[in-house]
């Protein structure tokens, strides 16, 4: 849950900055957002596989990220492709919930929280 709060905070703080630079398609922080998108996709698959019964929670977080970014069509597609890449790569790797899958979720939640925190930090 901490990851979700940090992610939502990061997205809220990024929205005004994005609105100012709406004419530019690529943002300096897009690499981090693309990685976060990939993590959200992987976590969506793995948590569902491991019976978390969260429904579409992680997909909704991805939709919130894209919405908060007010992304152009090209950026939106890149974010969605990253989400799908994360989802598909772990769908190919895991057919059942294993200890390794659960450990990967923990690693992803940690990395995602770190990315969200870095994205939320004001830049000088």
Model-derived features with residue positions:
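Bacterial N-terminal signal peptides that target proteins for export
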Residues: 1-8
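N-terminal signal peptide c-region/cleavage motif recognized by signal peptidases
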Residues: 16-18
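Compact alpha-helical subdomains of small soluble proteins
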Residues: 54-124
């Amino acid at each position: 849950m901490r990851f979700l709060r940090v992610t939502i905070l990061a997205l809220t703080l990024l929205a005004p900055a994005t609105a100012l630079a709406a004419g530019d398609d690529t943002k300096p922080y897009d690499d981090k957002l693309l990685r976060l998108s990939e993590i959200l996709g992987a976590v969506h698959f793995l948590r569902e596989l491991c019976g978390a019964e969260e429904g579409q929670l992680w997909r909704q977080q991805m939709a919130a990220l894209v919405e908060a970014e007010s992304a152009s069509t090209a950026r939106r597609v890149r974010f969605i492709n990253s989400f799908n890449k994360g989802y598909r790569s772990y769908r190919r790797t895991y057919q059942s919930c294993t200890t390794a899958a659960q450990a990967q979720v923990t690693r992803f939640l940690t990395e995602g929280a770190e990315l969200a925190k870095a994205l939320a930090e004001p830049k000088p």
